[in-house]
């Protein structure tokens, strides 16, 4: 694959995850919506990483802030803090008690606020690709 094809792959899968995020939110699966929102940002940052780095294989990390730094994402004022908060939505690495606490915290209003932030960040990252 060429560099451009790798970038397009990550963009496509990221956009697919945005749709899944919305569908999970509509279905009331707020925790999963945010988990998938995290994945969407991770993938779009990997597309940016490929654009701004010599290699075609982005780092194997789920840490959005680290990916953003290595992808040379031009952060706006509160982006770093928001990325660190969204890192917490990567539930696959969490213990069951943490998942349960997150599930309780994950109301419609809580999820809706972060979904707006995820979509804004996504758009900002796409604009830098």
Protein language model annotation of sequence segments:
Residues 1-129:
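Terminal alpha-helical segments
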